[in-house]
């Protein structure tokens, strides 16, 4: 099953230097999930080759315009294209009033069902689940209500060691219990077997955390622990620590420190200030603290493989 993150937009407040406001697409298996929807997201979909008709869930972190000004356009385009499937939006509660006002002024009644799920920035909770993944909110420290999102792959059942089963002449009727991780006792002979004797560890479940916008805040470290891929606010270089504090954003050193303390596999830095035409200074500073850091360059897809020692970059 694939697990990829495509960067659609990674700049902060305004488009600049060919970079666009925040948006990402997470692809897990054949399902696409949109995180944030800044201005110009639809055009970036076309540039990045995103099959955006397959997006059924949209997650909006907060209501600063660079994270949602592209949303009403996307909602309207789905209507014009006669979308049939329901569209779920997970976002701060006031966004529903904004959407309804825009649709009302335009005298538009959507041809598909829009299901709105208000998020709570004061508590971390499970907000979405299907057969493959869960999505939890992350409490972020910003000027207004803001949540990050943690995508977790569900742990697969243990794999049956068929050779061992046959070696001990064990009926496959015991497979359901073994897959749950339980030990078994054979009804036929009374003989007991530990689960470890008859099963193989499943592949480690993968995870992706999106933390933007936020000030440096170690209270979320427990939730980020051992995440395969972390995207973290990195608006300023290390000299901008006071400006970051004033605006509730993060510097290179702070983002890298979060990654290091959380023991993540890989760090993506983004939400770059428009003051930087060259992002190399940000990358270099972050790598001084956490070596396995990449820039969230638009159009790049980051693949999280089954064995997560390395996160592959797909051009």
Can you say where each PLM-predicted feature lies in the sequence?
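Local beta-strand/beta-hairpin segments that build beta-sheet-rich folds
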Residues: 8, 122-129
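Active-site neighborhood of phospho(di)ester-bond hydrolases with catalytic His/Asp-centered motifs
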Residues: 35-38, 55-63, 92, 208-214, ...
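Divalent metal-coordination and catalytic microenvironments
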Residues: 5, 36, 45, 62, ...
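A glycine-rich helix N-cap at a beta->alpha junction
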Residues: 107-119
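Binuclear metal-ion centers of metallo-dependent hydrolases, dominated by the metallo-beta-lactamase
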Residues: 119, 123, 216-315
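Active-site-proximal loop/helix segment associated with metal-binding centers of metalloenzymes
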Residues: 130-210, 214-222, 229
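Active-site metal-binding motif and surrounding structural segment of the metallo-beta-lactamase
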Residues: 39-90, 118-120
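Conserved beta-strand hairpin/beta-sheet module of binuclear metal-dependent hydrolase folds
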Residues: 1-50, 84-86, 149-151, 158, ...
């Amino acid at each position: 099953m694939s697990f990829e993150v495509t960067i659609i937009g990674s700049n902060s407040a305004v488009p600049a230097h060919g970079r666009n406001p925040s948006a990402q697409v997470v692809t897990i298996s054949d399902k696409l999930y949109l995180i944030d929807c800044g201005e110009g997201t639809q055009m970036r979909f076309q540039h990045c080759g995103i099959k955006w008709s397959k997006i059924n869930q949209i997650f909006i972190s907060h209501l600063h315009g660079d994270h949602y000004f592209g949303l009403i356009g996307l909602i309207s385009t789905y209507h014009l294209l006669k979308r049939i499937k329901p569209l779920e939006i997970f976002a701060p509660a006031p966004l529903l009033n904004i959407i309804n006002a825009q649709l009302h002024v335009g005298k538009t009644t959507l041809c598909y069902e829009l299901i709105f799920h208000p998020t709570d920035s004061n508590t971390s909770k499970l907000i979405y689940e299907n057969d493959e993944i869960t999505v939890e909110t992350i409490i972020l420290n910003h000027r207004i209500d803001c949540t990050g999102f943690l995508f977790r792959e569900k742990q697969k059942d243990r794999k049956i060691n068929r050779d061992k089963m046959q070696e001990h002449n064990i009926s496959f009727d015991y497979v359901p219990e073994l897959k749950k991780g339980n030990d078994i006792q054979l009804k036929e002979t009374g003989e007991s077997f530990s689960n470890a004797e008859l099963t193989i560890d499943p592949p480690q479940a993968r995870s992706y955390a999106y933390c933007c916008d936020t000030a440096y805040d170690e209270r979320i470290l427990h939730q980020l622990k051992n995440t395969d891929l972390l995207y973290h606010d990195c608006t300023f270089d290390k000299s901008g620590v006071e400006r970051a504090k004033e605006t509730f954003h993060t510097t290179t050193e702070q983002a890298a420190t979060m990654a290091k303390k959380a023991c993540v596999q890989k760090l993506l830095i983004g939400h770059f200030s428009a003051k930087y035409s060259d992002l190399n200074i940000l990358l270099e500073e972050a790598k001084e603290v956490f070596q396995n850091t990449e820039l969230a360059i638009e159009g790049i897809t980051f693949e999280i493989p089954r064995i997560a020692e390395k996160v592959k970059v797909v051009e």
